[in-house]
């Protein structure tokens, strides 16, 4: 809006001219030769003033134009001043050029005013969560929009107090997050001058809550059409979103607030109890405590497990012409084989060796393996853990980068994948049409199913978003490879391949199952399969590794010769510890939390010292067991899997408008508060048992104790805080130090990475990342070392620098085979991309 001016533009211009005239008068005083020029100057100035006044009347409509005219007038007066000085000492003819300058300025003022007016025109403000996303979206929306980032949440419950008024229907007390003050001021300023404001936070409950908080801060009515969402950051999706704004969904906001307040109730009320009874710095949480319980329960199963002995009996058989194949004993006297001792097995083997062998039955069939669904958040985290070795946190961080936009050269920032927090396997019609066209063009009609593959939604799928997929299948990994980091490329390739494979035909195998009779009592079985048609496996190799197992052509009734029997002893194994993938899968199956929360939950329980990672598996610490046992005894509901799952269901119902938020909070809070009071009285102060070592602290003489850190156990002085001495727990490798003859021990870096050094450090500074081996070099007798490359290759080599002995490790052959397959696959993909490009060019 134009603002009122105390002085009109004409008046200001006139004052500027008069000031210039005064200056000129001073410059020519005492010089008679210039008096005539000085006397004529006011007449010239009047015409300049008239012209300037005429110009400024055109720009009277806006404050921006007025300021442009002011600037122009000031420049004009300055030029006239200079011109006047020059004419005062030169010829009067110079005055003509001086009087022409305002006329030349006329068009300049018009252009400047028009340009300024264009710049200052009100724009539509779009608020997103991150700067990377803002940059990408601004490119798609154009100059009529300004896109700003809120940097996530701007308001939250206070850290210094409970922040929930229980007596007033659980009213939350929200405050602006510390450090966000300047950002809030800037957003308010932008919103004030904007023609419209659209809140474009993420399309989930958390994003809906952020939009609701933004509406409060910016003074926007949440019932207005101020909310826009998009599942992918592409030009069509963004432009479609701004055409269809809608009011903020209060039910989804309530669901997020209920979750936040439940977590605050448990964390704020229960954590101080752990501080008082066990030690400071601990925490409890509605989801984290259940996660710790799962890990502790699994460890208890492992500890209680008693291995049982059992035996299998394999055999080598051959046809008359000498073609051998393997089989395994399956049944004895019509019952499943069950051998539990060497004596029992030896007797059976002795009896079998006397029997005649023949083919009893041959079954041939075609087996199909269907492709898997495109990624959800959970399945992406699991696959990235299994195939790429990524933690859930790292997976989500990289996926966020791919979603928000990556610079693709001249194309600028491009969002490469759809929204990465989803539990849906649904694909849009547009995406299905695009990928089906790509499959047919790149692989042929045999790889394209007659109809799109539709996958059943999970029982908890909200189906608000699509599955995780590339925003365009044409952005094949090899085409964007040079713009991505190594980690971005690996995850993007996984997402792209899974999406394309999900819309391809099944893989087809020819399978053969053979039953072999050994006398009347024994039946052995052999099976083989060959890949007949790769189907989706041409793009995406899933976790089921099937090797071609070939059997000779066999006929029912055909006689066979026994080459040898192969009895083998086994022992049953305990259930494995959870790794990242299996833990995420279990949490999802049991409806504990939501996939988007798994990464921060895992990081929290590691940071608190409740669990540690050992060889990529989670192992509970003594502290984890202690806290879990206490919560199990006094707060059964908090660590009960079923109770936590039911709470999740009720949160879903709040989002659907079926359950009132305050009813849920009240039903949880009242019994929890009562249990908390009883537990506080009943639980005495708990002492964490410490494992005392035989290592003496050299600073104070006490026996050091074993402590659990984030990256494993270490020794610490029990005299803390008076004595702060700590030491790593050293693992002897059994290899002598080549420098001083001491022992080489395994140590841990601050990040938990293993390295090797002399036990006499710092007197001896021998150190290496490579693992010393007890094996001796076959050439010189020195101990061997093992170097492991990033690509997985292993190189055993001699520690004697003068000896050049290198030994190839068996694993390297497998790596080479895998690499060859990968190269062949890449070549095939490149050829397919080239073919698709040629087809596109032909169109």
How should each PLM-predicted stretch be described?
Residues 359-362, 370-384, 411-420, 574-586, ...:
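Short acidic, hydrophobic short linear motifs in intrinsically disordered regions
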Residues 2-25, 29-31, 35, 40-41, ...:
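Basic, low-complexity terminal or inter-domain segments flanking catalytic cores
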Residues 122, 202-203, 279-283, 364-373, ...:
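Conserved short loop/turn motifs at secondary-structure junctions
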């Amino acid at each position: 809006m134009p603002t009122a001016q105390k002085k009109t533009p004409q008046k200001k211009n006139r004052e500027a001219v008069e000031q210039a005239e005064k200056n000129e008068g001073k410059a020519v005083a005492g010089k008679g030769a210039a008096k005539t020029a000085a006397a004529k100057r006011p007449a010239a100035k009047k015409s300049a003033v008239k012209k300037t006044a005429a110009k400024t009347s055109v720009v009277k409509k806006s404050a921006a134009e007025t300021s442009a005219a002011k600037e122009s007038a000031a420049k004009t007066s300055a030029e006239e001043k200079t011109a006047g000085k020059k004419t005062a000492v030169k010829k009067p003819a110079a005055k003509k050029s001086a009087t022409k300058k305002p006329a030349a300025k006329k068009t300049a003022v018009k252009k400047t005013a028009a340009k300024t007016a264009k710049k200052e025109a009100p724009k539509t403000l779009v608020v997103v969560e991150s700067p990377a996303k803002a940059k990408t979206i601004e490119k798609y929306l154009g100059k009529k929009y300004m896109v700003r980032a809120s940097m996530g949440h701007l308001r939250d419950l206070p850290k210094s107090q409970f922040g929930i008024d229980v007596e007033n229907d659980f009213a939350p007390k929200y405050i602006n997050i510390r450090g966000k003050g300047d950002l809030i001021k800037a957003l308010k300023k932008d919103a004030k001058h904007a023609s419209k404001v659209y809140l474009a936070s993420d399309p989930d409950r958390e994003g809906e809550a952020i939009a609701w908080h933004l509406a409060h801060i910016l003074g926007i009515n949440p019932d207005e059409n101020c909310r826009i969402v998009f599942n992918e950051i592409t030009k069509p999706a963004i432009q479609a979103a701004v055409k269809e704004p809608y009011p903020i969904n209060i039910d989804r906001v309530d669901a997020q607030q209920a979750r936040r307040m439940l977590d605050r109730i448990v964390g704020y009320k229960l954590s101080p109890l752990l501080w008082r009874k066990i030690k400071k710095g601990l925490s409890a949480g509605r989801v984290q405590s259940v996660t710790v319980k799962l890990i502790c329960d699994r460890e208890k199963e492992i500890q209680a497990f008693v291995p049982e002995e059992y035996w299998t009996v394999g055999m080598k058989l051959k046809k008359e012409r000498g073609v051998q194949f393997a089989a395994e004993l399956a049944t004895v006297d019509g019952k499943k084989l069950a051998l539990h001792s060497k004596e029992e097995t030896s007797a059976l083997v002795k009896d079998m060796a006397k029997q005649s062998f023949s083919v009893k039955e041959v079954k041939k069939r075609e087996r199909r393996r269907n492709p898997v669904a495109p990624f959800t958040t959970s399945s992406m985290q699991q696959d990235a853990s299994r195939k790429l070795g990524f933690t859930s946190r790292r997976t989500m961080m990289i996926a966020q980068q791919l979603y928000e936009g990556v610079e693709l050269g001249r194309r600028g920032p491009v969002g490469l994948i759809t929204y990465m927090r989803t539990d849906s396997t649904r694909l849009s019609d547009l995406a299905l049409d695009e990928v089906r066209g790509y499959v047919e063009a790149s692989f042929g009609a045999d790889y394209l199913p007659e109809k799109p593959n539709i996958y059943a939604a999970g029982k908890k799928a909200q189906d608000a978003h699509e599955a995780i997929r590339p925003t365009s299948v044409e952005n094949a990994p090899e085409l964007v490879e040079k713009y991505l980091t190594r980690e971005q490329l690996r995850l993007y390739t996984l997402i792209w391949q899974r999406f394309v494979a999900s819309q391809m035909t099944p893989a087809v195998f020819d399978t053969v199952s053979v039953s072999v009779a050994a006398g009347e009592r024994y039946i052995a079985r052999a099976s083989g399969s060959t890949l007949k048609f790769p189907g989706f496996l041409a793009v995406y190799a899933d976790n089921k590794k099937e090797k071609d197992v070939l059997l000779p052509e066999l006929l029912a009734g055909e006689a066979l010769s026994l080459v040898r029997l192969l009895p083998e002893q086994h022992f049953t194994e305990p259930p494995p510890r959870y790794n990242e993938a299996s833990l995420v899968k279990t949490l999802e199956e049991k409806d504990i939390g939501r996939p988007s929360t798994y990464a921060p939950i895992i990081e929290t329980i590691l940071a608190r010292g409740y669990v540690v990672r050992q060889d990529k598996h989670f192992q509970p610490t003594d502290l984890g067991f202690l806290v879990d046992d206490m919560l199990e005894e006094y707060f059964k509901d908090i660590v009960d899997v079923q109770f936590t799952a039911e709470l999740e269901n009720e949160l879903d119902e709040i989002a659907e408008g079926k359950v009132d938020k305050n009813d849920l909070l009240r039903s949880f809070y009242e019994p929890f508060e009562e249990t908390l009071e009883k537990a506080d009285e009943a639980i005495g102060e708990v002492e964490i048992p410490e494992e005392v070592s035989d290592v003496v602290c050299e600073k104070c003489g006490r026996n050091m104790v074993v402590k659990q850190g984030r990256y494993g156990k270490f020794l610490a002085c029990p005299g803390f805080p008076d004595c702060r001495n700590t030491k790593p727990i050293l693992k002897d490798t059994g290899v002598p130090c080549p420098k001083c003859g001491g022992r080489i021990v395994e140590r841990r870096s601050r990040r938990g990475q293993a390295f090797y050094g002399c036990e006499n450090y710092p007197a001896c500074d021998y150190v290496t990342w490579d693992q010393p081996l007890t094996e001796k070099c076959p050439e010189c007798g020195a101990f061997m070392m093992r170097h492991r490359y990033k690509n997985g290759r292993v190189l055993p080599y001699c520690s004697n620098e003068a000896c050049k002995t290198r030994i190839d490790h068996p694993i390297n052959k497998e790596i080479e085979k895998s690499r060859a397959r990968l190269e062949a696959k890449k070549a095939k993909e490149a050829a397919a991309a080239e073919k698709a490009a040629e087809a596109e060019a032909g169109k």
